[in-house]
Amino acid sequence: MTIYQLRNLDKWVQKVKGEEDKVVRAVALQITNEFINRTRVRYGTARGNWHAELNAPAVNIERDYVGTPSEAAQHSLSKCTKAIAEAYGKRLFITNNIEYIEHLESLDSMVRGAVLEFNRAIDAAVKGLK
C-alpha cells in the first residue's frame, strides 16, 4: 500500500484560530473528492471502492459494485464523509483495496496529484472561514 501524507497542515490551521476542525474537514473533503473523481471508470468498481477510516486503513472491498461515474463517486464520497466529519485530532486513512488500484495510480496519479494540490485546498478552506 502506498501512503501519501499531507504536510504542514498545522501551520495553515494556526491561521484560523478556533476553526481548525472546519479547515481539516473542508480540506479532507476536497482532496478526497478530487482523487475519487480522478479514478478511472469502466464499471465504477474502482471509483466506488474508496473508504475512509479513523486510526487504521479500511480492509473491505466491494467487488460487486457497479455504477455510472457519478454514482460511483457519490457512493465513495458518502462513505468517506462520516469519517472525515470525525477526523479532527485523529489519523484519517482514505483507502481503496481493489486489487488493481495501484496500477491505476501508476497510470493517472489520482491520489498523488490531489495530495500535491493540498496547499490550494488549504488556502481555499482558510479563505472560506473569513
Residue ranges and their predicted role:
Residues 107-130:
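Protruding loop/beta-arch "assembly-hinge" segments enriched in small, turn-prone residues
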Residues 102-104:
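Short helix/loop capping segments that flank catalytic or ligand/cofactor-binding pockets
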Residues 6-7, 11-100:
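Short, low-complexity, charged/polar segments at coil/turn and helix-coil boundaries
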Residues 1, 5-8, 69, 110, ...:
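Non-membrane alpha-helical secondary structure
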